[in-house]
């Protein structure tokens, strides 16, 4: 397995805006291999599948994903009705949801994007 930081360096990618994280329980391993991205100047939003059912076979509870990104100054949200961001508690006993983790400094930016009028198709 290769670390995201190593792959991005090899490909000379200097900016990642969004990560969809669904690796069937290996989320924490993935995040540990992405510390340069998570702590860089342009930190990505993350949509993560956070489920104890998936993480327990890997030997950790899903709340460790929550804790890891919270310690990196990310805040957790569920997407509510009409795309609103609903804060999620970081101290629940168990998790089973797709959640959004946003860097603290980009929360307002994402709220504005979600509130922007959508063009009709």
Task: Map each language-model feature to its residues.
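Short internal loop-to-helix segment that lines adenine-nucleotide cofactor pockets
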Residues: 1-41, 54-60, 64, 120
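Short beta-strand segments
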Residues: 17-20, 47-49, 100-102
């Amino acid at each position: 397995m290769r670390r995201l930081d190593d792959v991005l360096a090899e490909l000379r990618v200097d900016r990642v805006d969004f990560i969809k994280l669904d690796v069937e329980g290996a989320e924490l391993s993935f995040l540990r291999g992405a510390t340069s991205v998570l702590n860089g100047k342009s930190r990505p939003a993350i949509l993560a599948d956070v489920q104890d059912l998936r993480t327990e076979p890997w030997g950790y509870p899903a709340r460790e994903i929550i804790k890891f990104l919270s310690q990196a100054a990310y805040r957790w949200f569920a997407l509510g009705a009409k795309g609103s961001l609903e804060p999620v508690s970081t101290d629940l006993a168990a998790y089973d949801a797709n959640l959004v983790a946003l860097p603290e400094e980009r929360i307002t930016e994402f709220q504005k994007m979600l509130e922007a009028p959508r063009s009709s198709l």
